Amino acid sequence: MGLPGLAGADHVGLTVPDLEAATRFFVEVIGCKVVFDVGPFISDDDWMEKHLGVDPRSKINKLRMLKCANGPSIELFEYDVKDQKAVGPKNSDIGGHHLSFYVADMNAAVAHLRGHGVQVLGEPTLMNEGPSAGINWVYFTAPWGMTMELVSYPRGMAYEANAKEILWRPAASAS
């Protein structure tokens, strides 16, 4: 049995090197909306270490919540901390990750990213076999180096034909 009362994924938290630059990227390039800011947060005791697993002298300059259409919210953190690593993990590293955005028109979305100077990794790949047949995907890199992805499967994926559970699907129209 899983978490009692689980309703879904609420948000994804990301630490960025420059909150304002990351916000411009998420708002102007991706299309998210700023909802609210909080912070700064600093503690003279071990609260940061106990509650967030970071150096106890860490300072969160600001935390910003973004809404991205009808998916989970994005929580951006900007820390001021002495032991911060400037390079995130690769996808192949333990803890590696990427953030994926569903788009209705893959070609238009890729052209939009490239038009904003975003590094797109290769060309979109359409899966033609297996349970994920029907998905079109491509990775891209945020200005601070984080790997992100575009996906599109307007006709669904092959696994859905006989599945007891269907993965997240975009709403007919996102706001």
Positions of predicted regions on the chain:
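Vicinal oxygen chelate
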Residues: 1-5, 14, 37, 74, ...
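Exposed loop/turn and edge beta-strand positions of beta-sandwich/beta-sheet ligand-binding modules
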Residues: 8, 59-60, 93-95, 134
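Short, structured motif recognition centered on aromatic/hydrophobic residues
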Residues: 9, 63-66, 71-76, 96, ...
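Core segments of cupin and vicinal oxygen chelate
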Residues: 15-71, 108, 115, 128-133
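A short acidic/small-residue loop/turn micro-motif
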Residues: 42, 81, 154-156
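Short beta-strand-to-loop junctions in surface cap/lid or active-site-entrance loops
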Residues: 77-83
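Short consensus segments that form the blades of beta-propeller domains
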Residues: 89-91
